[in-house]
Design a protein with these regions (language model features):
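Long, positively charged binding patches that form subdomain-scale interaction surfaces
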Residues: 138-214
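Active-site- and interface-proximal helix/loop "cap" or "latch" segments in soluble metabolic
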Residues: 1-157, 203-305
């Protein structure tokens, strides 16, 4: 997430996704799917231009739509089948809503006046929008009193020196930038075949004093039934969140246990709406709908060894 024209100009969302299979520990990953997107976001989180590596028909019909819940309906309307196929392209497009919502936080690290802008004051309709802003929340009081302070943590590079190919090539970002990074690792338990999921999610910004700081970070560990592909267990870990109330969201995730994985994109929104859940944990849970596709790719690769 960058602003090539500088402060208060068009936001660019440049996304990259990769599906890859590793057959054995130490093997190089086998890339089985990729996608890239570039989206221009104007005022009111409106899509002004959009391209993708696939050249998918229907993309241009998204121009004029806003990032937010209604964008998901537009994705289904203009790009039918992408959600059901769990494509890397869909994962990137689905993130337009969340990315356009949090992108501006990057400027709070560089411009002291940013947090006090009128557009950032808590409106009456923000109460109850998520578990952090539930009625009576201290986070609401902090924001109303003058912008409050987001709790952040300094974070190192995402790249693990012991597994340098664990991520696709990450873009070199300018100092004033925001990045949303997610991973979904899937394997079968060698003893009973249970599907094991380890997923991570991080929103971070460039910082003039600390290199990079994160404002949201979750890790999800889950299991699923190998025959029915239903969610058996889910254990979210809230590592970095902006307000004291936010970590309580981890206690809400159990309501989606028993859901078929490919139905998580809709079930999460139905059961964890507004103050029942956390917007960012919901994003992490919804992305697990891609697991059946990843599992099929894993099985196909292992079958050809």
């Amino acid at each position: 997430m960058t602003w090539p024209g500088g402060f208060d100009t068009q936001l660019r969302l440049d996304g990259s996704a990769r599906d890859a299979v590793t057959r054995e520990v130490g093997d190089a990953p086998i890339v089985v799917g990729t996608a890239t997107t570039s989206v221009g976001i104007g005022g009111n989180r409106t899509i002004e231009d959009i391209t993708a590596s696939s050249g998918r028909a229907g993309l241009s019909d998204l121009v004029g739509h806003r990032g937010g819940g209604y964008l998901r309906g537009a994705l289904d309307q203009f790009l039918p089948g992408e959600r059901e196929m769990g494509t890397p392209l869909y994962l990137l497009l689905d993130d337009i809503s969340g990315a356009s919502l949090i992108a501006g936080f990057a400027w709070s690290r560089w411009r002291d006046e940013w947090m006090g802008r009128p557009s950032l004051t808590i409106r009456p309709d923000m109460e109850g929008v998520c578990i952090g802003f539930a009625p009576g929340s201290g986070a609401l009081d902090e924001q109303r009193a003058g912008g409050g302070t987001h709790r952040v943590q300094i974070v190192p590079s995402l790249v693990n020196d012991a597994d340098p190919e664990g991520w696709h090539k990450l873009a070199d970002l300018p100092p004033t930038s925001m990045r949303r990074a997610r991973r979904i690792d899937v394997w079968r338990d060698p003893v009973d075949g249970t599907i094991v999921i380890d997923s991570g999610f991080q929103d971070s910004a460039g910082d003039p004093n600390h290199g990079r700081v994160a404002i949201h970070e979750y890790v999800l560990r889950a299991t699923a039934d190998p025959k029915t592909l239903t969610l058996l267990t889910v254990s979210p870990e809230a590592r970095i969140l902006p307000f004291r109330e936010c970590p309580s969201a981890v206690n809400t995730a159990s309501v989606v246990i028993g859901t078929q994985l490919d139905e998580l994109r809709t079930t999460v929104l139905q059961r964890l709406a507004r103050a029942e859940g956390c917007t960012h944990l919901n994003d992490a849970l919804r992305a697990l709908a891609e697991v059946p596709i990843l599992l099929a790719q894993l099985d196909a690769a292992l079958a050809t060894r």
